[in-house]
């Protein structure tokens, strides 16, 4: 049985008493965003709108995007990536479970030094997919667009990771799963978060 979105108390500045707001709205006020489902037009527009609003409100404060997503629409992923790099606020991306497909693209798109994977998270990269139906000319046009997008995504992965374009293209040919540590070595993230409760150091 679904429990819905939990409500938490929050007192607005200047208000005498707290009011109950849903958890996500409360966290938005702390500049914390979530990509925790398949990325589609609605979610992409919501993330972009929140980023633009928070950037306009306070450019000197960073944003935090927590990611646990199977990916989703390529064009939506590119739109979110572009918005992250358009705003002035620093963007920290944090993988808290799985960042697959376009979710790994967004993870890699965080500001340098601020791309984090939790110790047991996993990251997957692969080539953009496209499914075409219709007349031959339409199928050809669609396949050309998919190839153009694949080159674009590969080039951005290469820039963000420091890997050569040829290696990125080769790695994108099939689903490539990486542990948090492997993702750091590859350059998709800058750090693996430390397990503070059980660390012996």
Curated annotation (Swiss-Prot):
Its main location: plastid. The keyword S-adenosyl-L-methionine does not apply. It catalyses: Hydrolysis of proteins to small peptides in the presence of ATP and magnesium. alpha-casein is the usual test substrate. In the absence of ATP, only oligopeptides shorter than five residues are hydrolyzed (such as succinyl-Leu-Tyr-|-NHMec, and Leu-Tyr-Leu-|-Tyr-Trp, in which cleavage of the -Tyr-|-Leu- and -Tyr-|-Trp bonds also occurs). GO terms for cellular component: chloroplast stroma; endopeptidase Clp complex. One of its GO terms (molecular function) is serine-type endopeptidase activity. InterPro entries: ClpP (IPR001907), ClpP/crotonase-like_dom_sf (IPR029045), ClpP/TepA (IPR023562), ClpP_His_AS (IPR033135), ClpP_Ser_AS (IPR018215). It comes from the Eukaryota. It is found in: Plastid, Chloroplast stroma. Keywords: Chloroplast, Hydrolase, Plastid, Protease, Serine protease. PROSITE patterns: CLP_PROTEASE_HIS, CLP_PROTEASE_SER. The active site is at residues 101, 126. SUPFAM superfamilies: ClpP/crotonase. One of its GO terms (biological process) is protein quality control for misfolded or incompletely synthesized proteins. Its EC number is 3.4.21.92. Pfam families: CLP_protease. Belongs to the peptidase S14 family. Component of the chloroplastic Clp protease core complex. HAMAP family: ClpP. Cleaves peptides in various proteins in a process that requires ATP hydrolysis. Has a chymotrypsin-like activity. Plays a major role in the degradation of misfolded proteins. This is ATP-dependent Clp protease proteolytic subunit.
């Amino acid at each position: 049985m679904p429990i819905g979105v939990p409500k938490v108390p929050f007192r607005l500045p200047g208000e005498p008493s707290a009011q109950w707001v849903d958890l996500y709205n409360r966290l938005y006020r702390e500049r914390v965003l979530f990509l925790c489902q398949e990325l589609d037009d609605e979610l992409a527009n919501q993330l972009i709108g929140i980023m633009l609003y928070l950037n306009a409100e306070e450019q000197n404060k960073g944003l935090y995007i927590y990611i646990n997503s199977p990916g989703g629409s390529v064009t939506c992923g590119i739109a979110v990536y572009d918005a992250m790099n358009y705003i002035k606020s620093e963007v920290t991306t944090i993988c808290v479970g799985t960042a697959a497909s376009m979710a790994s693209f967004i993870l890699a798109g965080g500001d340098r030094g601020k791309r984090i994977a939790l110790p047991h998270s996993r990251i997957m990269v692969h080539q953009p997919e496209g499914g075409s139906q219709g007349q031959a000319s339409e199928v050809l046009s669609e396949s050309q667009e998919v190839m153009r997008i694949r080159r674009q995504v590969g080039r951005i992965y290469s820039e963000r990771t420091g890997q050569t374009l040829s290696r990125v293209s080769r790695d994108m040919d099939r689903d490539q799963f990486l542990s948090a540590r492997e993702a750091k070595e590859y350059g998709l993230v800058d750090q693996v978060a430390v397990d503070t409760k059980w660390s012996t150091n």
